[in-house]
């Protein structure tokens, strides 16, 4: 089993290098450029640094967010990461915007974040597996069917899960790096594929910016159409989904019940919801955050490690010491403050654009 996993990593590393070239080309067309289609707000979703710095109203939101963080080092880091003209950025985009070399995509060892939740995939994009009493829910599925076969499938087996038990793949938004591997589980294991209606449309719509390799990739067949507030239940686990337009028209936010050290804990997962190019997307984002606060959430996850902190480093620590400190976890009071920080920082960008 280990030898198969190592072979899979080697194959995936080669594919990841090719995909890195593809992603760099996409990013070169602007931060709004999308693998699966056109991103909502592409090229207009953020204020310029000058707009941001010169807007008194925006800076008032920034100051309020800083006050909420108080003297808590963890919250101060989240404020520094979240407030700014571009908001939280993936490390690859941050490096690119700074004119630095972008680190290549590389496969990583699976890591258990909570008692019943794991991360698989690459250092820059991943899939999440949630074990329930009656099967597995996957969140996202990497870039391609090949990555699903050579990375996700062997990783599931490595942590003691059976890929045949995957009941759902819930896709956070309709870009290739999230839905690319979904057809593999749909075709081989008959897993249900869930995505918002607007993003099913995005997946099915021809993308004029796609290169030939992208254009010819398999796409999942339309299946479960997620609506606002929809719940998906497998066994003892019910995930609640909220539609948060911004990165795409139908980007999702998830409320996921997990267990941590034997106790229940609620996770908020954002799939692009931190991008709010207009008032409507800001209001939807705020509502999703309010739902998370009301649910007593204590952790924030997303598909791209590094978006909200040194998440790759936190994962490395959990690989070394699975029972050690878990930096993904907040107290309820901390997380409620983090929610308010995110709300103020998102509002600061919208008002800086004069919206």
Where are these regions (language model features)?
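Conserved beta-strand hairpin/beta-sheet module of binuclear metal-dependent hydrolase folds
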Residues: 103-159, 253-274
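Short, hydrophobic/aromatic-rich segments at coil-to-beta transitions
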Residues: 112-118, 229, 237-240
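Positively charged n-region of N-terminal signal peptides that target proteins for export
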Residues: 1-5
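Active-site HxH/HxHxD metal-binding segment of metal-dependent hydrolases
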Residues: 54-57, 67, 117, 146-150, ...
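Bacterial N-terminal signal peptides
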Residues: 8-20
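Zn-dependent metallo-beta-lactamase
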Residues: 27-135, 145, 355
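Metallo-beta-lactamase
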Residues: 135-136, 143-145, 221-223, 231-233, ...
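Divalent metal-coordination and catalytic microenvironments
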Residues: 116, 130, 140, 173, ...
């Amino acid at each position: 089993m280990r030898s198969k996993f190592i072979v899979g990593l080697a194959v995936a590393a080669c594919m990841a290098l090719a995909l890195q070239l593809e992603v760099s080309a996409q990013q070169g067309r602007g931060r709004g450029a999308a693998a699966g289609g056109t991103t909502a707000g592409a090229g207009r979703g953020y204020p310029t640094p000058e707009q941001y710095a010169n807007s008194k109203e925006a800076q008032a939101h920034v100051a309020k967010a800083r006050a909420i963080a108080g003297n808590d080092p963890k919250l101060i880091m989240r404020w520094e990461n979240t407030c700014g003209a571009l908001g939280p950025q993936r490390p690859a985009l941050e490096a690119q915007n700074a004119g630095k070399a972008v680190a290549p995509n590389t496969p990583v060892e699976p890591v258990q974040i909570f008692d019943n939740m794991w991360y698989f995939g690459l250092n820059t994009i991943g899939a999440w597996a949630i074990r329930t009493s009656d099967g597995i829910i996957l969140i996202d599925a990497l870039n391609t069917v090949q990555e699903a076969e050579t990375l996700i499938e062997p990783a599931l087996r490595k942590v003691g899960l059976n890929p045949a038990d995957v009941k759902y793949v819930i896709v956070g938004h309709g870009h290739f790096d999230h839905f690319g591997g979904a057809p593999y589980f749909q075709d081989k294991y008959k897993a249900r594929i869930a995505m918002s209606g607007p993003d099913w449309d995005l997946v099915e719509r021809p993308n004029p910016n796609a290169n030939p390799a992208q254009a010819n990739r398999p796409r999942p067949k339309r299946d479960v159409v997620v609506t606002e507030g929809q719940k998906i239940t497998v066994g003892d686990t019910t995930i609640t989904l909220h539609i948060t337009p911004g990165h795409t028209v139908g980007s999702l936010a998830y409320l996921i019940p997990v267990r941590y050290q034997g106790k229940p804990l609620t996770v908020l997962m954002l799939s692009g919801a931190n991008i709010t190019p207009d008032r409507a997307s800001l209001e939807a984002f705020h509502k999703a955050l309010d739902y998370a606060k009301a649910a007593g959430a204590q952790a924030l996850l997303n598909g791209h490690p590094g978006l909200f902190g040194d998440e790759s480093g936190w994962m490395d620590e959990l690989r070394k010491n699975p029972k050690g400190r878990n930096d993904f976890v907040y107290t309820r009071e901390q997380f409620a403050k983090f929610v308010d920080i995110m709300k103020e920082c998102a509002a600061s960008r919208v008002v800086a654009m004069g919206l």
